[in-house]
C-alpha cells in the first residue's frame, strides 16, 4: 500500500482489527456494526459521529487501496467487511495490536500501549512493547514514529504514520489545549469538592448547635 489513509479510513481499519480480536464471533462486520464500532465512546480518541455515507465512501477507498474487502457469507446476502492490514505490511500480532490502538486512540506512551492492548495481545512487559515499536519504526517505510516529549509530559509518545507524517506543531497545540482543559477540569472538581465540604461542615455545625440546645 503506497497511498496513505485518511483519518476516517484509519478509524475504520482500527475498528475492524479491534472487533476481529475481541469479538471474533461477530466478525466480519456489517456496515451498521462498523459504523457503531467507529462511533463508540469507549476506547476512542477522539469520539466521532460518522454516518453511513461517510463510512461507505471510506470503505470504497480502502477496497481500492487493498486494505479492506467485502465478504459475503453462505447464509446471508448482507455484505460484511474484513481488513487485511497484517498481510499488506507483513505484521506480527503484537505489531497489529499496537497499530490498532494508535489508530483508535491517537498518540500513546509505552505504558498506555501495554495497558490498552491487553484485550488484543498480551505483552510480557514494557520491554516487549518497546521492541515491537522498534520493529515497525525500523522498516523501510516506518509505520510508527516516536514523538518528542512535550512540556508537561513525563514520557514520550508514539503515533502511527498510516495517515502520513505527524504535524508536530499541530500535535503540540492540541496537547496544550488538552492539558489546559484537564487542568480546568481539575480546578472545577476541587472547587466542587470544597463547596461540598463547606456544606457538610455547616450541616454538622447546625446539628451540633441543635444538640447543645438540648442541655440548655
Please provide the spans of the model-predicted regions:
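Positively charged, polyanion-binding regions of nucleic-acid-associated proteins
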Residues: 6-25, 89-107, 133, 138-139
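Residues in the recognition helix of alpha-helical DNA-binding motifs
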Residues: 15, 58, 132, 161
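Short acidic, hydrophobic short linear motifs in intrinsically disordered regions
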Residues: 23-49, 107-123
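A short, conserved structural fragment
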Residues: 56-73, 133-150
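A eukaryotic "domain-to-IDR transition" signal
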Residues: 78-81, 86-87, 110-124, 132, ...
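Helical coiled-coil/dimerization "stalks"
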Residues: 116, 148-162, 202-216
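Amphipathic alpha-helical oligomerization/assembly segments
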Residues: 177-200, 204-215
Amino acid at each position: 500500500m503506497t497511498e496513505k489513509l485518511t483519518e476516517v479510513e484509519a478509524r475504520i481499519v482500527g475498528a475492524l482489527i479491534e472487533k476481529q480480536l475481541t469479538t471474533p464471533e461477530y466478525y466480519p462486520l456489517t456496515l451498521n456494526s462498523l459504523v457503531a464500532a467507529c462511533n463508540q465512546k469507549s476506547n476512542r480518541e477522539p469520539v466521532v459521529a460518522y454516518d453511513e455515507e461517510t463510512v461507505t465512501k471510506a470503505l470504497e477507498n480502502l477496497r481500492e487501496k487493498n486494505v479492506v474487502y467485502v465478504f459475503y457469507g453462505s447464509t446471508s446476502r448482507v455484505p460484511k467487511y474484513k481488513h487485511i492490514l497484517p498481510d499488506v505490511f507483513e505484521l506480527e500480532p503484537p505489531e497489529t495490536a499496537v497499530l490498532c490502538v494508535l489508530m483508535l486512540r491517537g498518540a500513546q506512551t509505552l505504558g498506555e500501549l501495554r495497558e490498552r492492548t491487553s484485550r488484543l495481545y498480551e505483552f510480557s512487559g514494557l520491554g516487549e512493547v518497546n521492541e515491537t515499536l522498534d520493529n515497525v519504526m525500523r522498516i523501510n517505510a516506518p509505520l510508527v514514529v516516536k514523538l518528542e516529549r512535550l512540556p508537561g509530559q513525563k514520557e514520550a509518545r508514539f503515533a502511527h504514520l498510516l495517515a502520513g507524517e505527524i504535524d508536530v506543531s499541530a500535535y503540540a497545540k492540541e496537547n496544550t489545549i488538552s492539558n489546559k482543559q484537564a487542568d480546568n477540569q481539575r480546578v472545577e472538581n476541587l472547587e466542587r469538592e470544597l463547596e461540598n465540604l463547606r456544606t457538610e461542615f455547616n450541616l454538622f455545625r447546625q446539628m451540633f448547635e441543635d444538640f447543645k440546645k438540648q442541655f440548655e
